[in-house]
């Protein structure tokens, strides 16, 4: 659905050129919710604005639904953009227009007749749960309601793709959850492909099928969300994951425990999160596991749990128990003295 290939973008700055995007490529499948995460200055906002050519890349290919956007004439580009909705952190509502008019005015500009405009506005206000706010003004709405109006406006053009530029970053946690639930429902019920950018890992956790991690204008890590959570490879990715799942314990404690056994992080996903794998290990092997910390949550719609466990016993028995756990679809990682994770073979 969305194919970005070798995208490069450079801006002129007072201290010299700033390369915002460096040969970035990513692919978003039809019906997918794909997240791009990174800290400020990573290049993620520039990247998402290249998808509908609000930013023209210096080089590279931008395809949406197999159409190469970078070669389109202005008229054809406007038509193609009508199939790409976009929502922003700042809502971008007309302060002096009602909720109805904020959605209707852009529709009227496309040439829709009055009845079609009215029907479409009502349809999407119903979808976002604001049917009773038809005549309200933005100043009378909460932040979450303003974002719902912005979503309804984007959906009213009936796009195939929805771009979300930090759409929840200005909202409180409860409102963020409600907006994420709405995006999930839109994706499921309307079949709209969603590409979102964020600096919040909980957003990725709640809604994304796949995720790309950006740093200094580059995609440094990419994969299915569950795989990124289970086995982050690079420091930046680990920082994002640890912002939600931190099992750090003092290095000297790990050092002491490791003198008599081994400390390991166990990750459970989906059906394996409900299996008594650790209990089975104690019956099968001569080891004594001691749970140091743990947590359980969901990644999109599947359970995900982690335990930090000290395994006491002979190393051969511990190694066999690790293999048994991996055979039970439990991901096992050893923990070194400095708190960094290493994969256990």
From Swiss-Prot:
Residues 2-241 form the ABC transporter domain. CDD domains: ABC_MetN_methionine_transporter. It comes from the Bacteria. Keywords: Amino-acid transport, ATP-binding, Cell membrane, Membrane, Nucleotide-binding, Translocase, Transport. This is Methionine import ATP-binding protein MetN 4. The gene is metN4. It comes from Oceanobacillus iheyensis (strain DSM 14371 / CIP 107618 / JCM 11309 / KCTC 3954 / HTE831). It is found in: Cell membrane. Part of the ABC transporter complex MetNIQ involved in methionine import. Responsible for energy coupling to the transport system. The complex is composed of two ATP-binding proteins (MetN), two transmembrane proteins (MetI) and a solute-binding protein (MetQ). ATP binds at residues 38-45.
